[in-house]
């Protein structure tokens, strides 16, 4: 497996290329940026990645919270689709094959049935772009009151009958709903990428890696069981070099099965 982190984990006071150099120095093979809306920023990141040898893991789509694909307002759904197309193009231009997408948000104005149908209709519209660019749409489990069981998540992904729609599994996000290693074994080959973070069930908050209630040895074993060889990306609170070094070391222990 390859080790990565979200770009925002790295010190914000450094220039972009220096941030990637630090990532490489501390043992990260890749970084995950958010959607870039300016071509100049895409070119800058691509050049920094080439100069440092750090890969772009995938692109985290940015429009899906402000403009959910499940919104009752067509205008918002269209904005979300447009933002996702930008993210898919970003990934292609940066040499990646995956974009993270939050598919829907269930709330007081959007019921579960509507979230399911609207998000599926929107993603179906995005599949031709994904296919053309060679970039997968990876649906992530987040705190959006949607896809609340591994069987449902599996069926949702399978409903598209397309290799361009996959799962982006977040280990820490799922802990209040279920057992991460169980979800991994059910989702299996559908998993395109994995976010890792840790969570304290008693305090009900995210905590540093290996300081919460995630059973990391069991998660590691489940990943071996499904023969996952892709990216593990730390989506955690970052900071200075010392903080990021600690994140890298914690990930090394997780990868070692400790």
Spans of features found by a protein language model:
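Conserved beta-strand positions in the central sheet of alpha/beta enzyme cores
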Residues: 32, 58-60, 100, 138, ...
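Glycine/Thr-rich phosphate-binding loops of Rossmann-like dinucleotide-binding domains
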Residues: 41, 65, 109, 204, ...
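Histidine-acidic metal/acid-base catalytic patches
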Residues: 1-4, 9-27, 96, 150-166, ...
